[in-house]
């Protein structure tokens, strides 16, 4: 079979930078799915993307589908011929429909009978006649929330489309994409490049770079920007802050990246660096530069989309653009310093947190009390926790945070230090919002943990308490993130906290605000569900999670210890046999009516196997008790794994449901005792 390389390019107006990668990846995934459905073999497939184009390159694509043999079954032989052996009308009609005579048909014999059959050869369709329709279907399935129309056309896409190119090797594939006829013309850089006609699919990247002044390979463009930015920073003795999200956005904004270095007045360094970095990265898409000590330098690196004969002019222009933003930050900072955070408390009364839950002033009052309560249980400074909780939202009323919203908490920390608050209070101002996103770190300082937990629990209990739990994908108060935050803070810091106690205290502090009588139970269930999702994301087997959840441990740190212990136990050789035995025990005990017998009478142990099991349990229990008390569940389950032989022998030799009631109840008590030892950790009968 012959192969050729396929090139598809869509020339557009500027595509949304934050959506560019997803659009290109989805286009590729959709198109390769079409190829697979069409039984078109190919070696590899890659996507290219730049601000004004999406492209695919499929290497060694079959130029046609493979020929197929299609079995066309006809009537049964018994009904295909009459008594004289002549073909019936049914047989002749079937043969005529397939373009053959009855004599040309073959016979198919199965265990159900014999049929006429025709193995028809179906020639494969040429790839060039399939590509346009497949590409259009791939484009139709792109994740575009708000498509637009342009000109007089009714065609819709994320941005207006001007060119479409489909080449199979050197052959132009006829057809249309989004109403644009396929042609060889490729547009270059808007200012630097020239348009050209593409002669062969293999020359796309090279000609586009040489003639069009466009680096279409997204990953190459990204790597070039990163390398050049790092070199530029090193030249001025610094290190560029190149966050991947910002690097992705910048890569999606330029076709021909030119990395340049600019500077700003050193006087602006008196402003907390986070505010300066926020405006450089968030507003201007610049890369800040830091020295070896992590101190911000009065420089930044930016990426131009053009090679200029006078780069100094471009640098000067960017410096002029950023200067007013930095001056604003300086003004806000100097103005905010004139007022303490404490003096801003009354202004929180003017901001509503939630209609039924009161103002931000009401919220910080609750946070303060709950943070102090948590601090007392964890050994943190309760006075600092209460103070940090009270001030926790005051920086929201500052000019700086109102203008640069992402600096909330961080600016609170700086202002708290200027106000003379303790370092624990200042740090808690910043860390209260952690973790902000998946993979973010959690606070580790004791006071910070107390305040972060108090804030999240106050929101969780409050919103559930007024009957506004998240439904479906909607989660306006980010309760799922808050719940994961609560669990992570407690688990990762190994805090001795009980969710039931925390929820009850938060509910108490809300007082009469809450109308949902089941709020505490619903919040606990919500947190438990987050536990399951969190551990699944970490790769823990679902049966392990369910085994622990069955015991309903409400101390997250304890829950985590059980998860780790059961995961370890699951890897032991004895685990599957003991899990099966526990399942058998549970089934037996579930059928017992009334109260289960609890004490074992050694004198009634008549069988050797039950005597051995009872003796083994009696031997282990003194060793297990301190392990359970100290939550050393892994060692406890390792000890319990030694019961395997005794348990197996018991079920092999002993009739549990004996006719003698005394014997039966004694054996049930023994099994109940066995199960209880495992239930100190988890219900291992749920392990698969």
UniProtKB/Swiss-Prot annotation:
Its EC number is 6.1.1.14. It comes from the Bacteria. It is found in: Cytoplasm. Pfam families: DALR_1, tRNA_synt_2f. One of its GO terms (biological process) is glycyl-tRNA aminoacylation. SUPFAM superfamilies: HD-domain/PDEase-like (SSF109604). Keywords: Aminoacyl-tRNA synthetase, ATP-binding, Cytoplasm, Ligase, Nucleotide-binding, Protein biosynthesis. InterPro entries: DALR_anticod-bd (IPR008909), Gly-tRNA-synth_bsu (IPR015944), Gly-tRNA-synth_heterodimer (IPR006194). It catalyses: tRNA(Gly) + glycine + ATP = glycyl-tRNA(Gly) + AMP + diphosphate. GO terms for cellular component: cytosol. GO terms for molecular function: arginine-tRNA ligase activity; ATP binding; glycine-tRNA ligase activity. PROSITE patterns: AA_TRNA_LIGASE_II_GLYAB (PS50861). Tetramer of two alpha and two beta subunits. Belongs to the class-II aminoacyl-tRNA synthetase family. This is Glycine--tRNA ligase beta subunit. It comes from Shewanella oneidensis (strain ATCC 700550 / JCM 31522 / CIP 106686 / LMG 19005 / NCIMB 14063 / MR-1). The lineage of its organism: Bacteria, Pseudomonadati, Pseudomonadota, Gammaproteobacteria, Alteromonadales. The gene is glyS.
């Amino acid at each position: 079979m012959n192969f050729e390389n396929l090139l598809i390019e869509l020339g557009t107006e500027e595509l949304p930078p934050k959506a560019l990668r997803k659009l290109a990846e989805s286009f590729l995934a959709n198109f390769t799915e079409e190829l697979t459905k069409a039984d078109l073999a190919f070696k590899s497939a890659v996507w290219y993307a730049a601000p004004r184009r999406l492209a695919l390159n499929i290497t060694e694509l079959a130029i046609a589908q493979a020929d197929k043999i299609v079995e066309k079954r006809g009537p049964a032989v018994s009904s295909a011929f009459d008594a004289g052996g002549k073909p019936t009308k049914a047989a002749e009609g079937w043969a005529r429909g397939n373009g053959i005579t009855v004599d040309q048909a073959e016979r198919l014999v199965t265990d159900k009978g014999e049929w006429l059959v025709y193995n028809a050869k179906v020639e494969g369709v040429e790839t060039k006649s399939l590509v346009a329709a497949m590409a259009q279907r791939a484009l139709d399935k792109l994740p575009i929330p708000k498509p637009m129309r342009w000109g007089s056309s009714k065609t819709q896409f994320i941005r207006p489309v001007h060119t479409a190119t489909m080449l199979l090797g050197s052959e132009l594939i006829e057809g249309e994409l989004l109403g644009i006829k396929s042609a060889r013309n490729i547009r270059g850089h808007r200012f630097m490049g020239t348009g050209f006609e593409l002669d062969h699919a293999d020359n796309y990247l090279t000609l586009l770079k040489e003639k069009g002044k466009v680096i279409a390979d997204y990953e190459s463009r990204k790597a070039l920007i990163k390398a050049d930015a790092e070199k530029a920073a090193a030249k001025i003795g610094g290190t560029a802050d190149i966050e991947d999200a910002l690097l992705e956005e910048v890569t999606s904004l330029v076709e021909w990246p030119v990395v340049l270095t600019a500077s700003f007045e050193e006087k602006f360094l008196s402003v907390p660096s986070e505010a300066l970095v926020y405006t450089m990265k968030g507003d201007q898409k610049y890369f800040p530069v830091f020295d070896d000590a992590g101190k911000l330098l009065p420089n930044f690196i930016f990426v131009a989309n053009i090679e200029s004969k006078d780069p100094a002019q471009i640098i000067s222009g960017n410096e002029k653009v950023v200067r007013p933003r930095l001056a604003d930050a300086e003004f806000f900072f100097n103005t905010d310093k004139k007022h303490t955070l404490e003096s801003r408390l009354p202004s929180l009364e003017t901001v509503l947190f939630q209609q039924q839950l009161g103002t931000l002033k009401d919220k910080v009052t609750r946070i303060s009390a709950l943070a102090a309560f948590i601090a007392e249980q964890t050994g943190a400074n309760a006075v600092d926790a209460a103070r940090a909780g009270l001030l926790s939202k005051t920086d929201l009323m500052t000019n700086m945070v109102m203008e640069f919203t992402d600096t909330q908490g961080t600016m609170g920390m700086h202002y708290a230090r200027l106000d003379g608050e303790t370092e624990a209070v200042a740090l808690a101002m910043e860390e209260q919002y952690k973790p902000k996103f998946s993979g973010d770190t959690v606070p580790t300082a004791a006071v910070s943990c107390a305040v972060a937990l108090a804030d999240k629990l106050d929101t969780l209990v409050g919103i559930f308490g007024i009957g506004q739990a998240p439904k479906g994908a909607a989660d306006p108060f980010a309760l799922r993130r808050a719940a994961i935050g609560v669990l992570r803070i407690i688990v990762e810091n190994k805090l001795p906290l009980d969710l039931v106690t925390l929820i009850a205290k938060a509910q108490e502090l809300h007082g009469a605000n809450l109308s949902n009588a089941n709020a505490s139970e619903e919040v606990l269930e919500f947190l438990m569900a987050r536990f399951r999702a969190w551990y699944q994301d970490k790769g823990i087997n679902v049966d392990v999670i369910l085994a622990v959840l069955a015991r309903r441990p409400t101390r997250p740190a304890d829950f985590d210890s059980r998860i780790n212990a059961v995961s370890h136990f699951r890897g032991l050789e004895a685990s599957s046999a003991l899990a099966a035995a526990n399942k058998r025990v549970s089934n037996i005990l579930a059928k017992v009516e009334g109260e289960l017998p609890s004490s074992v009478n050694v004198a009634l142990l008549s069988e050797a196997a039950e005597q051995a099991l009872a003796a083994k349990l009696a031997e282990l229990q003194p060793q297990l008790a301190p392990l359970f008390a100290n939550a050393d569940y892994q060692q406890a389950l390792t000890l319990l794994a030694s019961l395997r032989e005794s348990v197996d022998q018991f079920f092999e030799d002993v009739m549990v449901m004996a006719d003698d009631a005394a014997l039966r109840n004694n054996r049930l008590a023994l099994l109940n005792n066995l199960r209880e030892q495992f239930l100190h950790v988890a219900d291992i009968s749920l392990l698969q």
